[in-house]
A protein has these predicted regions:
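Cytoplasmic helix-loop-helix junction between adjacent transmembrane helices
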Residues: 116-153
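Conserved MFS/SLC helix-loop-helix module at the cytosolic interface between two early adjacent transmembrane helices
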Residues: 72-108, 293
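C-terminal transmembrane helical hairpin of 12-TM major facilitator-type secondary transporters
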Residues: 296-340
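Cytosolic juxtamembrane N-terminal segment immediately preceding the first transmembrane helix
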Residues: 1-36, 41
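Helix-breaking motifs and short loop linkers at transmembrane-helix boundaries and internal kinks
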Residues: 53, 85, 106-112, 140, ...
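Central cavity-lining transmembrane alpha-helices of secondary-active solute carriers
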Residues: 64-77, 273-285
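Helix-loop-helix hairpin linking two adjacent transmembrane segments in secondary transporters
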Residues: 151-194
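Extracytoplasmic gate region of multi-pass secondary transporters
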Residues: 42, 229-280, 369, 373
Length: 424
């Protein structure tokens, strides 16, 4: 007698339970608002440089240190998430980065701003591993790739919101007021505290660790054990390529439009708003593809297509070529290439080290990604190359590396997340 898959008899959005939806929304809110607090800084680097009388390269270093601090925050959050649950580090991280951004808006000196933006990086890094593990462990296999794309693409929604705030409010509230808006995400903590539950797979895994006296006390070390280190190294390579690509495209884009081309705030905000809307929509579309053609190819294909697009618009000074090219890139190296990051990263590692592994591999990539803005600024300003050519070089190298790492990586489409003890 044939076994009927009852889950496929209902629409995919009805398959998840209420608790699964609540968990996913928590991760979505955390990531979207994380993006808002982080990307607002990309739009106000020039006025910060002017107000404090520091070189633009120094302001770009603030951006770099923020990214580097993400690794420390991520590893701490990953360890805490694997030990006590996904909810607690998620709440701490959201409250942390909200307060730091708000306080940075009162900066009396450049170094005050530097310190609190660096501390913001710690909280930012702590959000992603906790949120990704919470969402992906809670979600059914059938549509996990699609919802991974929607989740990761929500970074584009946060960037869209920060761009809209910049375009509409900058002239009236200035760069300080834009940083003060960063306190609003703190309200999400109330939602997570009262409505979100831990994923059952994590709860059962922790129960087994205790019952069998096989607790994994240092999950970071376990992902470098024999049999795991190759997977870990490939995941780090993958994320390094991806984040070098992302920050080559986006890190100094607004500054390029301001300094090299003299565009107004509204002209700068327009391509960023539309591109990030496309990032969100295309992430869902490529996520849908990931549930059918596999996680890797749903990222490799847009990654390869994005390289010639970069040559087309990055070297142009025509406003509409830049707008159209940047928006198209949002569907490729923006939303498409990153659509499967939450699902693919979490599916690669066992439950007892999932948050830690995701934290380390993803945010090791931010170390290299964080070098990109000051390097681009150095060549653009000190060598009078302008921003477009260094941005293009970083984009091409990063995208090619990203695709190679994915090609050699494992395929995880359809993989179930189980509470079995693998590393203990």
């Amino acid at each position: 007698m044939a076994v009927i898959d009852t889950a496929r008899l209902v629409p995919w959005w009805k398959e998840p339970t209420k608790d699964q939806w609540l968990a996913w929304v928590a991760a979505w809110l955390g990531w979207t608002l994380d993006s808002f607090d982080f990307t607002i800084f990309l739009l106000i680097m020039v006025p910060i440089s002017q107000e404090f009388g520091v070189p633009l390269t120094d302001v770009a270093v603030v951006f770099t240190i923020t990214l580097w601090m993400r690794l420390l925050g991520a590893v701490c959050s990953g360890w805490l998430g694997d030990r006590v649950g996904r909810r607690i580090p998620l709440m701490i991280s959201i409250l942390w980065y909200s307060l730091c951004n708000f306080i940075a808006g009162f900066a009396p000196t450049f170094w005050f701003l530097f310190v609190f933006r660096a501390l913001l990086g710690f909280g930012m890094g702590a959000e992603w591993p906790a949120g990704a593990a919470l969402a992906m462990e809670s979600w059914p296999i059938r549509s996990r790739g699609f919802m991974s794309g929607v989740l990761q693409g929500s970074w584009g929604i946060g960037f869209l919101l920060s761009s809209a705030a910049y375009g509409l409010l900058y002239t009236s509230i200035g760069w300080r007021g834009l940083l003060w808006l960063g306190i609003l995400p703190a309200l999400t903590v109330v939602y997570v505290r009262y409505f979100v539950k831990e994923p059952p797979v994590w709860v059962e895994n922790r129960r087994r660790q205790r019952a069998e006296n096989r607790e994994v006390r240092m999950p970071l070390f376990s992902i470098f054990k024999r049999g795991m280190i190759g997977n870990t190294a490939l995941a780090c390579w993958w994320m390094a390529g991806g984040l070098v690509t992302y920050y080559s495209i986006n890190g100094m884009f607004a500054t390029h439009l301001q300094k090299d081309l003299g565009f107004s705030p509204a002209m700068i905000a327009t391509p960023i708003i539309f591109a990030n809307l496309v990032v969100f929509l295309s992430s869902g579309a490529w996520g849908f593809a990931g549930d059918r053609i596999g996680r890797r190819w749903a990222m490799i294909i847009p990654g390869l297509l994005g390289i010639p697009v970069a040559f087309w618009y990055m070297l142009s000074d025509n406003y509409w070529v830049i707008v159209i090219g940047f928006v198209v890139q949002g569907a490729l190296l923006g939303g498409g290439a990153g659509s499967q990051v939450p699902s693919y990263m979490t599916e690669r590692f066992p439950t007892e080290a999932r948050a830690t592994a995701a934290a380390f591999c993803y945010h090791l990539g931010t170390i290299l990604g964080g070098i990109v803005p000051p390097v681009i600024t150095y060549f653009a300003v000190d060598h009078n190359l302008g921003f477009s050519r260094p941005m293009l070089v970083g984009c091409v190298i990063g995208a090619a590396s990203w695709c190679l790492a994915l090609f050699f990586g494992p395929e995880t489409k359809g993989k179930d997340m189980v509470p079995d003890l693998v590393l203990a």
